[in-house]
């Protein structure tokens, strides 16, 4: 459903954000 898509997008965005932070450090 829509909620699962939102959760998947949030999880993906979270992983990308963590990877971005790791690259910055």
Curated annotation (Swiss-Prot):
InterPro entries: Dermaseptin_dom (IPR022731). GO terms for cellular component: extracellular region. It holds the Pfam family DD_K. GO terms for biological process: defense response to bacterium. Expressed by the skin glands. It is found in: Secreted. Keywords: Amphibian defense peptide, Antibiotic, Antimicrobial, Secreted. Belongs to the frog skin active peptide (FSAP) family. Dermaseptin subfamily. Antibacterial peptide with activity against Gram-positive bacteria S.aureus and E.faecalis, and Gram-negative bacteria P.aeruginosa and E.coli. This is Dermaseptin-DI5.
């Amino acid at each position: 459903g829509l909620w699962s898509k939102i959760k998947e997008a949030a999880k993906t965005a979270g992983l990308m954000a963590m990877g971005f932070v790791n690259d910055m450090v």
